[in-house]
Amino acid sequence: MIKLQNIKKEYRRKSIFESLDMTFEDKQLTILLGENGAGKSTLLRMISGLEDADRGNITYFGDQVAKKQLQDMIGYVPQDIALFEHMSVNENINCFKALCKNPITEDTIDQYASQLHLADRTVAVSKLSGGTKRKVNVLIGLLSNPQILILDEPTVGIDLKSRYDIHSLLNKMKAQCLIILTTHHLDEVEALADRIKVIGTDPFYRDVLKDKQWHFDTYNKQN
């Protein structure tokens, strides 16, 4: 479980969260919804240890964890594709794998690559389609065998087949780790979510989810 308590965060003197309390359960996939600027990416970066809260505590499985340890616990997949374009898929994998304390085995890499339909890993990233780059991005996030997997809009702007490949793998990964994901696609919510959390002040997502009779938790900057 990840537990956030009394989190305050400002960005450029603008309040994002005042006193946020939120929990994420292990072995579940939680989707964060909210308008642009609501703080979804900031929240993911705070949980990942990439940004500090101005106030409050975040605990992981009951403990406060140093940033160095978080690097070993968390697989973080940013919205921007974080790959070396001039290198092949395998070279990218080997480069990022070398940074992991306890990386997954080559057999597991092959298994994930197969599930993502990454057939030719000798191709330079620069020659890949946007959807294939996104799939490699997700695979890189799994190299450390993370207890927590965090994905910031991992399927934005890609084709339906690539989205399906990523969804299939994430649904299998739910049994192994805690997953947090942001998206703007309601079909992605339906395909993946065990829990739904809505942040921000725009009523759009709340109204749509109510119409669909889906259960969700709501948070605004005062929470």
What are these regions (language model features)?
Residues L149-E153:
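Catalytic Walker B motif of ABC-type/P-loop ATPase nucleotide-binding domains
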Residues I2, F17-S19:
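Conserved structural motif at the start of ABC-family nucleotide-binding domains
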Residues Q176-T182:
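Conserved H-loop
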Residues G56-L70:
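Conserved ABC transporter NBD signature motif
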Residues S48:
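Helix-to-loop junction immediately C-terminal to a conserved catalytic motif
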Residues N94, I104-R121:
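Conserved ABC ATPase "signature" region
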Residues L33-E35:
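The feature captures the beta-strand-to-loop junction immediately N-terminal to the Walker
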